[in-house]
């Protein structure tokens, strides 16, 4: 029997299953990767917004990570919602011990509803503790603005932001997602590495049901990196995956519903292909 590749997510929860650890694990499964999850925050949220957040003590996060790493090593790691500086330091300790494992950061700062998920002190700490360790960071435009301090209102500003991530912050790669741009028809993303810039374009679907798209996108990249895919191929797969997940959204809930984490499997009949 061939052992599956393993991906670890470290993030908050979503009881409705649209975002956070729950969305990550479903995305890992759809990519044929065995998923593990460490919880940083218990988040009471739904398609209407975030009602309550209970951030776990960093020692509880450490205990979970210790359990994982004392038993098995993941082939790739992603972090999502990390609401305290102490928890960031705890995670950094494990990442520093396993620098060869690909690491993806989804810098979750705002929920789709606009609710803030990270205080200013923690935002500043993110730049010094975790971002320099990342193989790729996946900010949307508002998150890229928060991190770089720029007002990103043009392609020129996107290019400037990408250079800040690579040359000043020290991330190996960053993909700045254009889903929040004003282009009504095309969703354009920009992948920056030391080798240069590559762009990805997809049709933009007219729907409000996009809850958890950032989590899902970064989770698919993580799963593909766990399989040993090059970063460009991982991002290309994630773009196709998220596009189909939005196109075939299940329209759950009374607000911004989740995407369909299994649409890629069912539409393309790739149950076997995705596990390769």
UniProtKB/Swiss-Prot annotation:
Binding site for 4-amino-5-hydroxymethyl-2-methylpyrimidine: 45
Enzyme Commission number: 2.7.1.49, 2.7.4.7
Catalyses which reaction(s): 4-amino-5-hydroxymethyl-2-methylpyrimidine + ATP = 4-amino-2-methyl-5-(phosphooxymethyl)pyrimidine + ADP + H(+); 4-amino-2-methyl-5-(phosphooxymethyl)pyrimidine + ATP = 4-amino-2-methyl-5-(diphosphooxymethyl)pyrimidine + ADP
Alphabetically ordered keywords of this record: ATP-binding, Kinase, Nucleotide-binding, Thiamine biosynthesis, Transferase
GO molecular function: ATP binding; hydroxymethylpyrimidine kinase activity; phosphomethylpyrimidine kinase activity
Pfam family membership, one: Phos_pyr_kin
Pathway in which the depicted protein is active: Cofactor biosynthesis; thiamine diphosphate biosynthesis; 4-amino-2-methyl-5-diphosphomethylpyrimidine from 5-amino-1-(5-phospho-D-ribosyl)imidazole: step 2/3; Cofactor biosynthesis; thiamine diphosphate biosynthesis; 4-amino-2-methyl-5-diphosphomethylpyrimidine from 5-amino-1-(5-phospho-D-ribosyl)imidazole: step 3/3
Listed GO biological process terms: thiamine biosynthetic process; thiamine diphosphate biosynthetic process
InterPro entries, sorted: HMP/HMP-P_kinase_dom, PM/HMP-P_kinase-1, Ribokinase-like
Recorded GO CC terms: cytosol
SUPFAM superfamilies: Ribokinase-like
Top-rank taxon, per record: Bacteria
Similarity remark: Belongs to the ThiD family.
Functional description taken from the UniProt entry: Catalyzes the phosphorylation of hydroxymethylpyrimidine phosphate (HMP-P) to HMP-PP, and of HMP to HMP-P.
Protein's UniProt name: Hydroxymethylpyrimidine/phosphomethylpyrimidine kinase
Species per Swiss-Prot/TrEMBL record: Staphylococcus aureus (strain MRSA252)
